[in-house]
Curated annotation (Swiss-Prot):
Main subcellular localisation: host cell
Natural source organism: Hepatitis E virus genotype 3 (isolate Swine/United States/swUS1) (HEV-3)
Family: Belongs to the hepevirus non-structural polyprotein family.
Binding site for ATP: G990, V991, P992, G993, S994, G995, K996, S997
Identification of the protein by name: Non-structural polyprotein pORF1
């Protein structure tokens, strides 16, 4: 637990300390983890190098080069994070398996040290293939790697990574290689020590030792145990100095990261490299001091150490700076060489004072000390000489200047003016020196080095020019020139959709800066005449519009355009935003798609783009396939005559209305600014600004679509034309190619009016969540598609050309293209089209469409998608159009995944669409079917599926055969090969023990191939010629072959036998153990075929009933003929055949076989032994557990000491605990109460039409006095902790706001914040931390009173019936037995009580904010205790129900109609209600004792009663970050909460009150109601109420409330409409559509109870709450609206009101 008891952190006194603490926490959270073991010196070096990064040392590994590798890993992480999917140059073998994001790796053939690296490379995964090719000299097995080197490889990739692999390549060579790869960015990590800039020698620094021999540089870091870096000095110098490459392949080189002398260089291809000077070593800790004489000695017979001595020595910066400061400031008399030597000796000692380093010191050699003293002395002497000379010469100059006369000064003033470029002292030049003089200096400081050198690339520019003139004579002859002098050119690949080597950039392309288009523009109608023709506007309207002009004021803001159009004396406003709904004159819906960045918008078959040009705003419009371009000049237009404007508007309105009444589909409603605006024909958010708001002329421009305005008389186009011509005021229609009344048919997946077409079936291949129609939200945010965790598709059939038929979701496909079932306008529709729009909204940009042929539209944004258009068979059956729909999708390269086009709302028969796909697809394509279509296909599919062996599969399988042939086991496979081709097969799949093997007859087969020797012997005993896979390679040629357990055979051997046999019949179970890659070479998964079962057998003759239930998740349709009910037993002596999971367990258990070897075998009795080494196998492979559990027919003993099978839900703990608690095998009556739906005999609900949701809730707020709350929740002050011990976290951070998706902003429930930490504390303390009032008294009196309701209970026995009901309830909740543990009370998990805050609040007619009540919580007992006590409590509850009088109703255990009849029969009674306050909190030792008394009556075991008393009397509630240790109380999550709360409620009512004319009583938890004529408090009530601290609130009235219903004597029970509607207002209907659908179904269930009593409910419920009947009437109508799926939701973000200033604690 993160909290400490009663700990208060010391306050932070200053803001500086708070900022420092936050900075320290942030540094630690982002620290670099150092894993190797380091010495003290290595640790100090690493800390200094990695500054300012924080380091965290967690030593766990030993490395040869710890310092370099830590730096390498840090820079590698940076490079890979920036590069994304990339090409890698010279990858280290150990990093191959850890980085699957690499597209291709370039290697060189290993020599020297690289051979050792390859030998130690991983032997599994992708690295195994690379390792095999490197060490054996084999060619690569795939395109993920090569051994051509970076310079000779031509794999196309946009981004590259080179980690310490470019030290042998010049920068110019790298530029040429990048161009060869088509690469634009390369992240290169290089080690560039500054010592390579110095002469040869040996250089000691604080971090490393560098030996420079003139040609090579060898670097070894502190503590290295093997050789270090060895690189060419000249290449390193080039990398240090070069910042750009010029020539044919220009580059810029930028240093983006540096740790010491380790750099990350970003090489970027740039057309014109600019100067990029940089300082490579600004944090260098050494200066290099030159030795004047250098190394001495001469070559001799014996090698001398002098030849390796350096001419420069690395001196710490602090030593040199302090020495120079000391010497330069000495007095002339005190300056001498001996004093300098004394000072240098002093500062070279390291001095520490405690943990503080006072002087860092310097451990130098004799040569270095001598060189430093010499250089320092001579340098200081030179500086002193300059000082002396400067002072003396300066004094003489001053004397001369001040001695000048007036004439000389006047001459200087006239002819020596300074000007702007005057710098004081610049004219003085007393001293000049040469570079080779001693006075030029003796040391080099890397901190001031600046480099900016450009290097030309090595392309043969001159030779290329010569070749262009003299070497291409063949071109003149018409032949192709293959001139060898041509340079390497960068690759320009395909756009990317069919080029496997192409990888797009992860960096968003730079978007062009768009000019602000705001301004005033003049629109002339004659500019848009081409648009009017495209829109099929009648001639007279087009003529009127051409004569008019309009002035448009455009205001642009991010993602929004506002237009104010002035047309004569009328003004219109429109607002362009993405997702705006456009008004239509038909049932078709139009949603505007607007992209401000692209400056485009579109809806339906209309789209436009706009651009600001010098001439004005240029708009390109595409409408119904025709294009129009107009340029609107800036400024205002002449005002049009009001009469002409009015005539134009009236004619346009009549045209829209006529189209609305007579067109089949309609189109856009054309407003005046839609024809005379700058964005025609769009007018989103149309508003007409009129001086008179009641002017009827407004109806000409503003309308709302309704079905009442749509004529149901749909006449054909031929009949519509005469009507149009005869309409008054309308012109004759124009004769365009496509008549305006016959618009394109609606989208295949769109919603269709229910009156015009029958309801369509659910669109094909979609889950229900996709088909949900939601209110139009903002356009969905584009998120990168995440692959599903596991595929659910099911292979149904494979064609000879490789095409496959699946049942499942189209989006699980790996094909290059996805085919969308679109509409002629390619607009976002419903169903599958809507699913495409949700995932890929960019795919519907009309500007990105590529029209190949017909109606199909191809798009590559954001991935390759084909929008295919099938015919609408509701309008016309057109088989040719259906064929063309599929044919138009074949103009592509690559494979495509199809749905069944047209089989959804367009109602094309499945068979026709399937046949069309079968005739018009390409090899390798995939077809995805819905479950109904899959059922049709299963009944009509071809007899035998086909398996296609491609060239790649054959090549990989032959490689596996070669590897097998080299082993002793696989000698029989020598010379065997697999060739590409097609294999037909029959595959019988079935559940374990279904008799697949027994169904094979000897006359039907020649050879049987089995995976194991055990199976081979079993088949041979039956008389079959059976062989293992390797041996069978000699006998399967041309034979009839049966392959048993086919999925477990090595796939290359499976393909070999299938191809060689004359006929092949496969047997197996796809859910059992597949083929295992024992070699870890990666070949098995690469060639594993997808086998489609031709038949499934679901009846097992082997598995007992309990095993079938365990494996039903894998086999939903499994049935058994076995009569054995229970066969699994735990921890009994081993019997029968022993089954283990690993080879180690097999060696430890003589006679055992592994599960893999037992696959396909049958035993009478088995023993499963699970050992600890099989944990990973069992958790990762469900197939191993299935095989182990399905080998026996009678009995299986499970020995699971480590608990491995229990972790995956295979345990008998529930059964053991049941029998331990005294349960017996037996039968009781089921606890399920039969319920039925009310018949519609009156149907009064039909008289309540759907009503407005907003008005209903507003009326409810007015009646109850509730108002919109400014806050989302209230955190009430935390009460004082009166008893117990509270553990709480130190930080009580809370969120400031809550996001809610609700029906209304007026909430009618007590507001709380369930997810807040302070709310959890308040609930814990307020509900369970109050002091319990103990009551010591005998229970006999209360039990005697309780006998009025519950007579004395006889012995009760918990049976397996209750156990079954308990398990059934757990399964319905999605639980398994893994959470039920063995009854070990020392284990905290057995008795843990988990607390969590409830998210639902209580409906109230009072105050919703200032109620001062704490929240509600659930304290859930452990599953172990629930399973232990649950069967007993269920049995006791059944016995109580059997003893109850008929007029006493308990909980929910009754039929509602019976309770209603009992209430209606008590017409002369009043309703007695009792409401408890703090019902759970006031339960104490007395209520617990009464529960134990009842348990004893029932014969429950004493140890179980005492355990229950112990758990209830002292407990710990465990919240996520808090816990409370307390006593007594009642927990809402106990297994018997409802039972014992109801019993305690009955006992209190029976003991405290006496009733006259008692008729009916109902009890449920703390809620109760009694129908009687009068009542009084009994004489014994005061003692019980005072002793237990009960808080009773009695209400006695004619009509009452109980458990969500209204109790009306004489009428019956009625649904509580007000309470239900109030609770709905508090629900969060988001964030997804699933939650909204659940609540909608709950509303439908509630309305079902109102079927016959709606009118009575209005009168009665209004009297209970004191509200008007009209409110209840409106609430019922509002519920009808919600049930119809037409609810309106509001998304609100409200603050949380925090009233908890402090948590009050009581210190014991």
């Amino acid at each position: 637990m993160e909290a400490q008891q009663f700990i208060k952190a010391p306050g932070i006194t200053t803001a500086i300390e708070q900022a420092a603490l936050a900075a320290a926490n942030s540094a630690l959270a982002n620290a670099v983890v150092v894993r190797p073991f380091l010495s003290r010196v290595q640790t100090e070096i690493l800390i200094n190098l990695m500054q300012p990064r924080q380091l965290v040392f967690r030593p766990e590994v030993l490395w040869n080069h710890p310092i370099q590798r830590v730096i390498h890993n840090e820079l590698e992480q940076y490079c890979r994070a920036r590069a994304g999917r990339c090409l890698e140059v010279g990858a280290h073998p150990r990093s191959i398996n850890d980085n699957p994001n690499v597209l291709h790796r370039c290697f060189l053939r290993p020599v020297g040290r690289d051979v050792q690296r390859w030998y130690s490379a991983p032997t599994r995964g992708p690295a195994a293939n690379c390792r095999r090719s490197a060490l054996r000299g084999l060619p690569p097995v795939d395109r993920t790697y090569c051994f051509d080197g970076f310079s000779r490889c031509a794999f196309a990739a946009e981004t590259g990574v080179a980690l310490y692999s470019l030290h042998d390549l010049w920068p110019a060579d790298v530029a040429e290689a990048m161009a060869r790869h088509g690469m634009t960015r390369l992240y290169a990590a290089l080690h560039l020590p500054p010592e390579v800039l110095l002469p040869p020698g040996t250089y000691h620094t604080t971090s490393y030792l560098l030996i420079h021999d003139g040609d090579r540089a060898v670097v070894t870091y502190e503590g290295d145990t093997s050789a270090g870096y060895n690189h060419d000095v000249s290449i390193l110098r080039a990398w240090i100095r070069t910042t750009k490459i010029v020539g044919d392949h220009p580059l810029v080189i930028e240093r983006v990261r540096a740790i010491g002398c380790h750099f990350v260089l970003l090489l970027t291809a740039a057309p014109e490299p600019s100067p990029m000077p940089y300082v490579p070593y600004p944090r260098s800790t050494e200066v290099y001091v030159r030795s004047i004489f250098g190394p001495g000695g001469s070559p001799s017979l014996f090698p001398s150490a002098c030849s390796t001595k350096s001419t420069f020595h690395a001196v710490p910066v602090h030593i040199w700076d302090r020495l120079m400061l000391f010497g330069a400031t000495l007095d002339d008399q005190a300056f001498c060489c001996s004093r300098l030597m004394t000072y240098l000796r002093g500062i070279s000692y390291k001095v520490t004072v405690g943990a503080l380093v006072a002087n860092e010191g310097w451990n130098a050699s004799e040569d270095a000390l001598t060189a430093v003293i010499t250089a320092a002395y001579l340098t200081i002497c030179h500086q002193r000489y300059l000082r002396t000379q400067a002072i003396s010469k300066g004094m003489r100059r001053l004397e001369v200047e001040h001695a000048q006369k007036f004439i000389t000064r006047l001459y200087s003033w006239l002819f020596e003016k300074s000007g702007r470029d005057y710098i004081p002292g610049r004219q003085l030049q007393f001293y000049a020196q040469c570079r080779r003089w001693l006075s030029a200096g003796f040391h080099l400081d890397p901190r001031v080095l600046v480099f900016d050198e450009s290097v030309p690339c090595r392309c043969r520019t001159f030779l290329k020019k010569v070749a262009g003139k003299f070497c291409c004579f063949m071109r003149w002859l018409g032949q192709e020139c293959t001139c060898f002098l041509e340079p390497a050119e960068g690759l320009v690949g395909d756009y990317g959709h069919d080029n496997e080597a192409y990888e797009g950039s992860e960096v968003d392309p730079a978007e062009p800066a768009h000019l602000d288009v705001s301004g005033t523009y003049a629109v002339h109608g004659r500019q848009l005449e081409a648009l009017y023709r495209a829109l099929n506007v009648p001639h007279d309207i087009a003529a009127r519009a051409s004569r008019l002009t309009a002035t448009v004021e455009l205001t642009a803001s991010p993602d929004r355009l506002e237009c104010r159009t002035v047309l004569g004396n009328k003004t219109f406003r429109t607002t362009v935003v993405d997702g705006a709904h456009l008004e239509a004159n038909g049932p078709e819906q139009y949603v505007l798609s607007f992209d401000a960045s692209r400056q485009s918008m579109g809806a339906g078959s209309h789209s436009l783009t706009y651009e600001l040009t010098p001439a004005g705003l240029q708009v390109r419009i595409s409408s119904n396939g025709l294009d129009c371009t107009a340029t609107f000049p800036p400024g205002g237009a002449p005002s049009a005559a009001p009469g002409e404007v009015a005539a134009f508007c009236s004619a346009l309105y009549r045209y829209n209305r006529f189209t609305q009444r007579h067109s089949l589909t309609g189109g856009l409603w054309l407003h005046p600014e839609g024809l005379l605006g700058i964005f025609p024909p769009f007018s989103p958010g149309h508003i007409w600004e009129s001086a008179n708001p009641f002017c009827g002329e407004g109806t000409l421009y503003t309308r709302t679509w309704s079905t009442s305005g749509f004529s149901s008389d749909f006449s054909p186009p031929e009949a519509a034309a005469p009507v149009l011509a005869a309409a008054p005021g309308l012109p004759h229609p124009t004769p365009p190619v496509s008549d305006i009344w016959v618009l394109p048919p609606p989208s295949e997946e769109s919603q269709v009016d229910a009156a015009s077409v029958p309801p369509a079936p659910e669109p094909a291949g979609l889950p229900s969540s996709i088909v949900l129609t939601l209110p139009p939200p903002l356009p969905p945010v584009r998120k990168p598609p995440t692959p599903p965790p596991s595929r659910t598709r099911r292979l149904l059939y494979t064609y000879p050309d490789g095409a496959k038929v699946y049942a499942g979701s189209l989006f699980e496909s790996d094909c290059n293209w996805l085919v969308n079932a679109s509409n002629p306008g390619h607009r976002p529709g419903g169903g599958l089209c809507h699913a495409f729009y949700q995932r890929f909204p960019e795919a519907f940009y009309p500007t990105e469409f590529i029209m190949r042929e017909g109606l199909a539209a191809y798009t590559l944004t954001p991935r390759p998608i084909i929008h295919a258009v099938a015919p609408d068979y509701r309008v016309e059956q057109n088989p040719k159009r259906l064929e063309a729909a599929y044919r138009e999708t074949c103009s592509r390269r690559g494979t495509a995944a199809y749905p069944l086009l047209g089989s959804g709302i367009y109602q094309v028969p499945v068979s026709l669409s399937f046949d069309a796909w079968e005739r018009n697809h390409r090899p390798g394509d995939e077809l995805y079917l819905t479950e109904p279509a899959a059922a049709w296909f299963e009944a009509n599919k071809p007899a035998q599926p086909a398996l296609t062996i491609t060239e790649d599969t054959a090549r990989t399988a032959n490689l596996a055969l070669e590897i097998d042939a080299a082993t002793d086991v696989g000698r029989a496979c020598a010379g065997c090969t697999i060739s590409p081709g097609i294999v037909h097969y029959q595959f019988t799949a079935g559940v374990p023990g279904s008799g697949k093997s027994r169904s094979i007859q000897q006359g039907d087969v020649d050879v049987v191939v089995v995976p194991t020797r055990e199976l081979r012997n079993s088949w041979r005993r039956r008389g079959f010629a059976a062989f293992t896979p390797h041996t069978a390679a000699r006998v399967t040629i041309g034979r009839r072959v049966v392959i048993d357990e086919a999925p477990s055979l090595p796939p290359h051997l499976l393909l070999l036998h299938m191809q060689r046999a004359s006929s092949v019949h496969l047997l197996g179970d796809p859910n059992q153990i597949p083929a295992i890659d024992f070699e870890h070479a990666g070949l098995v998964p690469a060639i594993r075929p997808e086998l489609a079962p031709t038949s499934w057998w679901h009846v097992t003759h082997r598995c007992p009933a309990d095993v079938c239930e365990l494996i039903r998740g894998a086999y939903p349709k499994i049935q058994t003929t076995s009569r054995v009910l229970r066969s699994l037993f735990w921890n009994e002596p081993a019997i029968g055949q022993k089954l283990v999971f690993t080879q180690a367990a097999k060696a430890a258990n003589p006679g055992a076989i592994t599960v893999h070897e037992a696959q396909g075998a049958t035993f009478t009795e088995t023993t499963i032994i699970a050992t600890a080494d099989a944990r990973g196998l069992i958790q990762s492979s469900r197939a191993h557990a299935i095989v182990a559990l399905t080998r026996h027919t009678e009995k299986c003993v499970i020995l699971d000491a480590p608990g491995l099978l229990r972790e995956v839900g295979i345990s008998d703990v529930i059964v053991n605990n049941f029998f331990l608690a005294g349960g017996e095998v037996g039968h009781h009556r089921p606890s399920v109460i039969p319920r039925g739906n009310p018949d519609q005999n009156l149907g009064t609900l039909q008289a309540f039409p759907p009503s407005c949701q907003i008005s209903a809730y507003h009326q409810l707020a007015e009646e109850l006095g509730h108002r919109p709350a400014p806050v989302a929740a209230v955190l009430p002050p935390c009460p004082e902790l009166e008893q117990g011990l509270l553990y709480m976290p130190q930080e009580l951070t809370v969120s400031d706001s809550v996001l809610v998706f609700e029906l209304t902003d007026i909430v009618h429930c007590r507001m709380a914040a369930p997810s807040q930490r302070k709310a959890v504390l308040s609930t814990l303390v307020g509900r369970y931390g109050r002091r319990t009032k103990l009551y010591e008294a005998a229970h006999s009196d209360v039990r005697e009173s309780l006998a009025r309701f519950i007579p004395t209970i006889g012995p009760v026995q918990a049976t397996t019936c209750e156990l079954y009901e308990l398990v059934e309830a757990m399964v319905e909740k999605g639980q398994d037995g893994s959470a039920v543990l063995e009854l070990d009370l020392c284990n905290r998990d057995v008795s843990r009580i988990t607390f969590f805050q409830k998210d639902c609040n209580k409906f109230t007619t009072g105050e919703t904010i200032a109620h001062g009540k704490v929240g509600q919580g659930i304290s859930a007992w452990s599953k172990t205790f629930c399973a232990l006590f649950g069967p007993w409590f269920r049995a006791i509850e059944k016995e109580i129900l059997a003893l109850l009088p008929p007029n006493i109703f308990y909980g929910d255990a009754y039929e509602e109609s019976v309770f209603a009849a009992a209430v209606s029969g008590a017409g002369s009674c009043m309703v007695f209600e009792n409401d408890f306050s703090e019902f759970d909190s006031t339960q104490n030792n007395f209520s617990l004792g009464l529960e134990c008394v009842v348990m004893e009556e029932c014969g429950m075991p004493q140890w179980l009663i005492r355990l229950y008393h112990l758990v209830r009397s002292a407990w710990i509630l465990q919240a996520p970050k808090e816990s409370l240790k307390g006593f007594w109380k009642k927990h809402s999550g106990e297994p018997g909460t409802l039972l014992w709360n109801t019993v305690w409620n009955m006992a209190i009512i029976a003991h405290c009150y006496e009733f006259r004319d008692f008729r009916v009583a109902a009890f449920k938890g703390d809620d109760s109601v009694v129908l009687c004529s009068d009542y009084r408090q009994s004489r014994n009530a005061a003692a019980l109420i005072a002793g237990c601290g009960l808080k009773l609130k009695v209400d006695y009235r004619p009509i009452g409330l109980y458990a969500g219903v209204v109790v009306a004597p004489g009428l019956g029970t009625l649904p509580d409409v007000v309470r239900f509607a109030g609770r709905l207002s508090e629900k969060n209907w988001g964030p997804g559509p699933e939650r909204a659908e659940q609540l909608r179904l709950a509303v439908c269930d509630f309305l079902r109870g109102l079927t016959n009593v709606a009118q009575v409910c209005v009168d009665v419920v209004s009297r209970v709450y004191g509200v008007s009947p009209g409110l209840v009437h409106n609430l019922i109508g509002m519920l009808q609206t919600i049930a119809d799926g037409k609810a309106h939701f509001t998304e609100t973000i409200k603050p949380v009101l925090d009233l908890t200033n402090s948590i009050i604690q009581r210190v014991e």
